[in-house]
């Protein structure tokens, strides 16, 4: 009996169902952080300021179904849109797969748990502030959202 490879290894982003596409989101929340664009160089500057709809504990949108109505500049990721988006974090599953890479061990589709993205230190949990409290974005420029994280390996729990 042969094991069937996971869908993200056998289908292109264009071929995925809506459910498969949505499941690629690891729930890190990095894409929901505000970004600035440097005028002269056009460089993306990441901040640690989260969209007001991002739940800073779960790192998920608190109103995903209505997000684009409530936050008009919220970007809807699609396979076609990926080519024009240069600000997705390097750890983002959509970006990784579009670049021909694979998902990391901490991705929920690989680990089988939605908690590994937090346990590995990949998510914005404990690192971001809501836009409601932040003040000027220029005061919150941060490098970490735009770098490939060096995840912490989970602790092995030994039976007592």
UniProtKB/Swiss-Prot annotation:
<dbReference type="Pfam" id="PF03692">
    <property type="entry name" value="CxxCxxCC"/>
</dbReference>
<dbReference type="InterPro" id="IPR008228">
    <property type="entry name" value="UCP006173"/>
</dbReference>
<dbReference type="InterPro" id="IPR005358">
    <property type="entry name" value="Puta_zinc/iron-chelating_dom"/>
</dbReference>
<protein>
    <recommendedName>
        <fullName>UPF0260 protein GDI1595/Gdia_1801</fullName>
    </recommendedName>
</protein>
<comment type="similarity">
    <text>Belongs to the UPF0260 family.</text>
</comment>
């Amino acid at each position: 009996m042969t094991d069937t490879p996971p869908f993200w290894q056998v289908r292109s982003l264009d071929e995925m169902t809506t459910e498969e596409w949505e499941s690629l989101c690891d729930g890190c929340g990095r894409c929901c952080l505000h970004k600035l664009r440097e005028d002269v160089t056009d460089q993306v500057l990441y901040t640690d300021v989260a969209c007001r709809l991002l739940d800073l504990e779960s790192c998920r949108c608190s109103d995903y179904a209505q997000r684009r109505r409530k936050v008009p500049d919220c970007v809807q990721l699609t396979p076609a849109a990926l080519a024009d988006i240069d600000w997705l974090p390097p750890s983002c599953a959509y970006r990784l797969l579009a670049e021909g890479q694979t998902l990391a061990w901490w991705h929920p589709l690989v680990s089988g748990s939605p908690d590994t993205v937090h346990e590995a230190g990949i998510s914005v949990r404990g690192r971001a502030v809501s836009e409601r409290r932040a003040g000027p974005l220029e005061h919150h420029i941060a490098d970490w959202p735009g770098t490939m994280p060096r995840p912490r390996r989970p602790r092995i729990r030994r039976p007592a």
